[in-house]
Structures are given as structure tokens and as C-alpha cells.
């Protein structure tokens, strides 16, 4: 329904459904359902084990790769794009559909998050790329990539420094997922960074986005 009601927005990058940002503002019930997922106690229990007891929800998004049409997500680190200081974020990625190699599941470089280091990113000017920056190829070993295979209803959690990406969906099956972004109460959401470094078709305005204290206190 979210994709159908937003034909002008790339389905790979529907940001903010929990606040209605990706909708035409009429779908209050739809937004509430997404927010309920973000504030689910079982989800927050898992996040607490990583970030601690004070948890802030700052973003969510639906990433839908249509059959035969889904675009490439280049190798990147989320920390390159996000207005969180210090960078301490975990992403909870829930599979709506089965996410398999043939329909463009997420791929990642194991251990690339250790050391909390942002690698050099370079510009990408390709029409089939979701992002306009990616990690410089010489910065990592692509041959070590692992497919993050998930079946519908399963989830994975990854770090803000993890190098990851995904291939285009060349199969006849859609690949959709819902991702929720959390930061600890000790981090600051920097509204001075107004626009995320996504592709021209999917700019993210960070300056006025609402955030939620999901659990604990704001430190």
C-alpha cells in the first residue's frame, strides 16, 4: 500500500513511513502501524543489548526492490551519510519478503565495522544506483562479501560502520524490507546536516525530522 500510494518516490527508498513522511499525509493508520513496529518491546530489548537502556528512534524506511527493476545499492557505510554525533547507531532490518541472492539481498563485508572507521567514499554517477557515494574499491576486499539471506519475518541487526550493499533484483520476485534506525541517548541528532547524501531521486532532509525517545532517558 505504501509503495502504491507513492508512485513518484523510488520504491528502494521510502523514508519515514512511521511519521507519514513518505506518504501523502492521509495514511495516519498506516504510519501508526510502522511506529508500533519501531517501538515494539521485543525489538527494543534486542537494541538495548547493543546500545544500552537509553534508546532513541531517529529513522525508519521501506526498501522495496521490484521484480526485474530493483536498483543497485553500492558498497557503503551508513555513517558516511547520517547526522548522528558521535556515530553510534544500529539498524534493525526486517524481511517483508524472502531476501535471497537472486532478488538482491543485502551483502556485507564481515568485520568491516571493527575499529569504528569510516573508509574513503567516492562519487557514483550511475542512474541505477540508489546512492551517489560508495566506498572506494581499493579500501576493502570485495571477495570476502557474504550474502545476508533472510526469510520473510526474520531480521538482522547491523552496525553503522559495516560495509554493505546489494545487487539489482534481476529475478521475478520482489524483495522488500523494513529497517528501523536507533541511536543511544548519549548521541546527538545533528540538524545542522540538512540533506543526506543519497541519490538525486531520494534526498533525505534531516533538518526537521522528528525523533522518538523509545526507551529510557535522553542523556
Predicted regions and their residues:
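Short, surface-exposed loop/helix-turn segments at secondary-structure junctions
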Residues: 14, 77, 126, 130-142, ...
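Non-heme Fe(II)-dependent double-stranded beta-helix
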Residues: 1-75, 80-84, 121, 193-195, ...
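A generic structural micro-feature
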Residues: 71, 84-88, 139, 170-174
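Short acidic/polar capping segments at secondary-structure boundaries
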Residues: 62-69, 79-80, 87-88, 96-101, ...
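Non-heme Fe(II)/2-oxoglutarate
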Residues: 8-10, 155-157, 161-219
Amino acid at each position: 500500500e505504501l509503495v502504491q500510494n507513492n508512485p513518484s518516490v523510488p520504491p528502494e527508498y521510502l523514508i519515514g513511513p512511521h511519521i507519514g513522511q513518505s506518504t501523502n499525509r492521509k495514511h495516519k493508520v498506516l504510519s501508526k502501524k510502522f511506529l508500533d513496529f519501531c517501538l515494539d518491546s521485543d525489538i527494543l530489548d534486542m537494541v538495548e543489548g547493543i546500545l544500552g537502556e537509553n534508546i532513541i528512534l531517529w529513522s525508519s524506511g521501506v526498501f522495496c526492490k521490484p521484480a526485474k527493476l530493483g536498483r543497485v545499492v553500492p558498497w557503503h557505510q551508513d555513517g558516511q551519510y547520517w547526522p548522528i554525533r558521535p556515530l553510534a547507531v544500529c539498524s534493525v532490518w526486517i524481511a517483508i519478503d524472502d531476501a535471497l541472492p537472486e532478488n538482491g539481498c543485502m551483502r556485507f563485508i564481515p568485520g568491516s565495522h571493527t575499529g569504528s572507521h569510516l573508509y574513503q567514499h567516492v562519487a557514483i554517477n550511475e542512474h541505477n544506483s540508489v546512492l551517489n557515494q560508495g566506498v572506494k574499491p581499493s579500501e576493502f576486499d570485495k571477495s570476502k562479501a557474504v550474502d545476508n539471506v533472510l526469510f520473510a519475518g526474520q531480521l538482522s541487526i547491523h552496525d553503522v560502520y559495516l560495509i554493505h550493499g546489494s545487487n539489482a533484483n534481476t529475478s521475478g520476485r520482489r524483495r522488500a524490507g523494513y529497517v528501523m534506525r536507533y541511536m543511544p541517548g548519549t548521541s546527538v541528532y545533528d540538524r545542522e546536516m540538512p540533506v543526506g547524501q543519497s541519490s538525486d531521486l531520494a534526498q533525505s532532509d534531516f533538518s526537521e525530522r522528528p525523533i522518538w525517545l523509545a526507551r529510557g532517558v535522553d542523556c
